[in-house]
């Protein structure tokens, strides 16, 4: 983190790069806040550019360009308690109980389905009308499908996104809207990533896209420190 902080300060103070043209990605909000404070101390600049987690940065992308996927700028970012509230609605509507699947297991299952088994799920969320998603949910018979399609339906109905969606929706926008992709690529002159050993494939793809114009990517990682080996 110290290496990234020093590099950020050098780019701003010595090379005259505007902080708004720099992206620095950390893995936790705590690390991002610490880095902002360190950079402010080094540069004296109130503007510390984009220093954020992957998900926090994707919120910035979507707040600017969510119209490209038919979502309002005021979309909701879901935490676990929000997801559990949606699961409760689904369980009540379809007569499921915690004996069928606990909420914790259901959350894990949804994440694994989105990452591994059904990675194109976001196309359903973006392109299918709400009624069609509802129909998929109502026609589902297995607990797995009831929970998964019920959850996608609830998300779309509330204009809500979970952490997986933030990345996938951003990637979808960049794949389908060249003008938006180019705008972000040109804006981000230098990209730096901390804890690179814990990155997952969608996050890796997002970084590849973003550094595709200036091609200035700087990463810091330690393979002995990885905490997400399942990725």
Task: Label each residue range with its predicted role.
Residues 54-57, 106-113, 169-170, 187, ...:
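Short acidic/histidine-centered micro-motifs embedded in hydrophobic/aromatic stretches
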Residues 1-71, 77, 158, 182, ...:
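P-loop NTPase Walker
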Residues 1, 23-24, 31-32, 50, ...:
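Conserved helicase NTPase motor core
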Residues 58, 114-118, 192, 211:
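Short alpha-helix boundary/capping elements
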Residues 46-49, 67-164:
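ATP-hydrolysis module of ASCE/P-loop NTPase motor domains
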């Amino acid at each position: 983190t110290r290496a990234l902080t020093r590099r950020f300060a050098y780019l701003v103070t010595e090379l005259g790069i505007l902080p708004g043209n720099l992206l620095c990605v950390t893995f936790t909000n705590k690390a991002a806040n610490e880095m902002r404070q360190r950079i402010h101390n080094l540069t004296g600049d109130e503007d510390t550019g984009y220093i954020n987690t992957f998900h926090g940065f994707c919120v910035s992308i979507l707040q600017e360009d969510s119209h490209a996927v038919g979502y309002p700028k005021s979309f909701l970012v879901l935490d676990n308690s929000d997801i559990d509230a949606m699961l409760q609605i689904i369980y009540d509507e379809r007569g499921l109980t915690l004996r069928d699947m606990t909420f914790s297991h259901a959350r894990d299952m949804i994440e694994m389905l989105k990452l591994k088994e059904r990675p194109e799920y976001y196309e359903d969320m973006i392109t299918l009308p709400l009624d069609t998603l509802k129909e998929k949910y109502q026609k589902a018979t297995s607990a797995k499908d009831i929970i998964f399609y019920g959850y996608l339906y609830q998300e779309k109905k509330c204009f809500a996104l979970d952490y997986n969606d933030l990345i996938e929706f951003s990637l979808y926008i960049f794949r389908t809207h060249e003008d938006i992709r180019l705008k972000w690529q040109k804006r981000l002159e230098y990209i730096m990533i901390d804890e690179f050993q814990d990155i997952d494939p969608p996050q890796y793809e997002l970084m590849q896209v973003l550094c595709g114009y200036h091609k200035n990517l700087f990463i810091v990682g330690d393979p002995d420190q990885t905490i997400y080996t399942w990725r």
